[in-house]
A protein has these predicted regions:
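Position-driven detector of the extreme protein N-terminus
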Residues: 2, 23-26
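Bacterial N-terminal signal peptides that target proteins for export
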Residues: 2-15
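Bacterial N-terminal signal peptides
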Residues: 12-24
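Carbohydrate-interacting regions of secretory-pathway proteins
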Residues: 27-215
Length: 215
């Protein structure tokens, strides 16, 4: 099967355009959108789409971004990691400020990080309720649901995150008193933004990425 490669723009460090959404996509509230179709993915050398699987090419680094912004949504995807992989699903995020401009659910090899950086965590803000990540090389299934300040994550059928972002009232501080990286209180981060998938140097694979905008 002919290999198709996803659009990767390096005009700014770690910036890719993940062209999985068409203009006016927010009008399709309640309808499931398949994010991995040749028509919807911009093609180039840094991400490869082959037989329905999206993965980084040998060119290192980067985040592949959606063109459209989303607010309330449910997204499901499958991923698998290579050894010592570090990746993430960014959402309600700003491609120009990925570190500070939105949220991330950690995707990583089980066991290489702990606490609020372990697989399934709301990165640097909340550790998962249970350990749910599968070993490297096995497909994981993740569902993230955002509705207003509510963020819920289910990993491999296990609820791992169920938070109200309005509880994060102070910059650089979590409700449990621990510190985080965010210069802005999480409750004040935008309620809409882009999706991103991260490549941090070790291979990770994605498939069956589908989003349902919520009314």
């Amino acid at each position: 099967m002919k290999t198709q490669k996803a659009n990767f723009l390096l005009a700014k460090p770690l910036l890719l355009l993940f062209a999985f959404c068409m203009p006016g996509m927010l009008a399709f509230a309640g309808k499931q959108i398949d994010l991995l179709t040749p028509k919807a993915i911009g093609l180039n050398k840094n991400w490869v789409l082959e037989k329905g699987i999206l993965s980084p090419s040998k060119t290192p680094g980067g985040i592949i971004w959606s063109k459209e912004k989303f607010g309330d949504f449910e997204i499901t995807l499958q991923y698998k990691t290579s050894a010592k992989a570090n990746s993430g699903l960014f959402f309600r995020s700003d491609p120009k400020n990925a570190v500070q401009g939105g949220f991330e659910i950690q995707i990583a090899s089980p066991g290489i990080y702990g606490g609020k950086h372990v697989v399934g965590s709301l990165y640097d803000a909340k550790e998962p309720a249970v350990a749910a990540g599968k070993p490297d090389g096995e497909w994981n299934t993740m569902k993230v649901t955002c509705k207003g300040p509510s963020i819920k994550v289910v990993l491999n059928g296990k609820p791992v995150i169920n938070v109200d972002i309005d509880d994060w009232k102070e910059p650089r501080k979590n409700p449990d008193g621990s510190k985080n990286k965010f210069k802005t209180a999480l409750k004040d981060l935008p309620k809409t933004g882009h999706f991103g998938l991260q490549y941090h140097g070790q291979l990770v694979w994605f498939q069956n990425i589908k989003i349902t905008p919520l009314k």
